[in-house]
Amino acid sequence: MLKVEMLSTGDEVLHGQIVDTNAAWLADFFFHQGLPLSRRNTVGDNLDDLVTILRERSQHADVLIVNGGLGPTSDDLSALAAATAKGEGLVLHEAWLKEMERYFHERGRVMAPSNRKQAELPASAEFINNPVGTACGFAVQLNRCLMFFTPGVPSEFKVMVEHEILPRLRERFSLPQPPVCLRLTTFGRSESDLAQSLDTLQLPPGVTMGYRSSMPIIELKLTGPASEQQAMEKLWLDVKRVAGQSVIFEGTEGLPAQISRELQNRQFSLTLSEQFTGGLLALQLSRAGAPLLACEVVPSQEETLAQTAHWITERRANHFAGLALAVSGFENEHLNFALATPDGTFALRVRFSTTRYSLAIRQEVCAMMALNMLRRWLNGQDIASEHGWIEVVESMTLSV
């Protein structure tokens, strides 16, 4: 199996001053291309350290993706490190120098002398185009390893990997079929509770069951070779049965996007009134393109479930909205939710202890609860579902 590794560079990455989103993206992208990473390393802006790890990994990896260090400043050392590791010098790539000059000219800017450095590549390097920036990439062969050097800017990095590097890998190596990965996301049940039921399932050869907990959701993943797809799809029915009502969506699209699409398909507009969630619902749904009307965030106040239900019913009528959704303030571990629809208004009062969680997490939980109510109504289900750690203490319905 092809051994693919990644090397992230830069003091800011090494010291945790920025999150290495490029590494996470590459690992996921390559995994779904049948190229799972076998190792990831991070090195700071130190020439000796860079040269050392390039030489070291060249003895073990078949492919190494090096990210960062291609800029015009003194701490951008990747090209020099590659040349030093190979025992050769840097040469000026005249065509890229002209391309950079054109890039700046089209934007009404003068290229700084320091940018010339970005056109200096190891003598044996293969040039890799960057159509969206000034940091070209390059590839070198060092011992057994084919190394690709890429820019640190995420938008440039992704374009280069997808359109330049992956085609080269497919041309040079015989790549396996991408693995099959079935995913669903649950809300309201603990990871241990799900695992207790799912761990008894008999998995096909080479297939693994994975869990990813990110409060307030848990993602279940069944991953395996393409040759086992039929068996995995059969097993997936058992996984969904065990997860039961806690399943809120399948795949990776996300609940706000799925709700947005359903609202649009059914030509429902939605108005929101938020207290405890502080506009989080509006943010999530607007980013997904949901058909929102007037949305409000009001200070938290104590109110009965009946008050919340009557208020959101009036709001739906006043704004001529198809649907209206309300989240009350959070008082003494209690919270109200209400959804006004053409069929009537449905309201829940819930209790859950959240002292161990931050305010941001508590707001995420409440936003997910509200979205799940909306999802269930759109799917023709009762708005309340069983949640192991959220107790429904009161419910009511207002007729149309």
UniProtKB/Swiss-Prot annotation:
UniProt record similarity statement: Belongs to the CinA family.
Function: Does not have nicotinamide-nucleotide (NMN) amidohydrolase activity.
Organism superkingdom: Bacteria
InterPro entries documented for this protein: CinA, CinA-like_C, Competence-induced_CinA, MoaB/Mog-like_dom_sf, MoaB/Mog_dom
Secretion signal, residue range per the UniProt entry: none
Name by which UniProt lists this protein: NMN amidohydrolase-like protein YfaY
SMART domains linked to this entry: MoCF_biosynth
Gene3D superfamilies the UniProt entry points to: MoaB/Mog-like domain
UniProt gene name: yfaY
